[in-house]
Amino acid sequence: ASGLRKKARKWDRVVKTGRTHLQDATPMRVGQEFSGFAAQIEYGTTRAERAMKRLAENLPIGGTAVGTGINTHAEFGRRVSASLKKRLRIGFAEATNHFEAQATRDCVVEASGELRTIAISLSKIANDIRWLGSGPRCGLGELVLPATQPGSSIMPGKVNPVICESVMQVTCQVMGHDLAISTGGLGGTGSLLQLNVAMPMMAWAMIDSIRLLANAASILQDKCIDGLELDRTVAEGYVERSLMMGTSLAPVIGYENAARLAKQAHASGLTIREMALELELLEPEMLATHLDPASMTEPDSGGSGKSGKTRGSTGRKGGGR
């Protein structure tokens, strides 16, 4: 997440067009967008760490056959767990309920689910970057991705987003591992009566998921995010042309009038600003105040058209809106 946070700070004053349903939406800052990416990874990592802690603290050592601990010393599980904790420096602890710990692998399923969530976050981030870097002439073109594999077998000069696409493929594999682990925890498949028999497969899939995610995250940052560049001219140019600029006029001229203005601007090929000036809906000074893109990236501080306190990539009020 550090690379994403760095970009969020670097580009926090650049205003761009937000997009929902792949359609133009109201303005936002590039820094806010990247703060959302960073928060995804940070939240996912925190959730995974909590799940891994619960997994480490649920060792079924000492339960023997069915969880009763027959034919073993009463302190066997505690002592072995303590020894493992000391040698490996991992917070291992004996399970508090051996019947749950041996008959199921619910904590493994939970931990795998958190890894799947990280995979989904990485896939979303990689795909968004790929979309924002589409072009260079006929796509969105807001981001310029590092040319890690320039050229095409048939199209000279083409640069494909291969790092983003490789990360997306890795995340598919992690999600496949999660399905396998979930199946291993099912009653009648892995978990049956007093013993889960699928731990070899579940452990292998879990370890492979961790390896894949670690490598993918490292490569995404080193080979893509660190070298990302922003085409500020393109990003800010979209903002002025966006019909959603009229959203800020709705509280002033009414929703229906703002919608009518957007339709007229679209039909005439004019911007919202140009159309509003032509129709003389507001005085030029007032129009300039309400059509200030930067003020649209924050909550209104009382109808003045000026923004309130900064939130998003600065971290003062959490994630971006």
Predicted regions and their residues:
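Conserved, well-structured ligand/cofactor-binding cores
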Residues: A1-R321
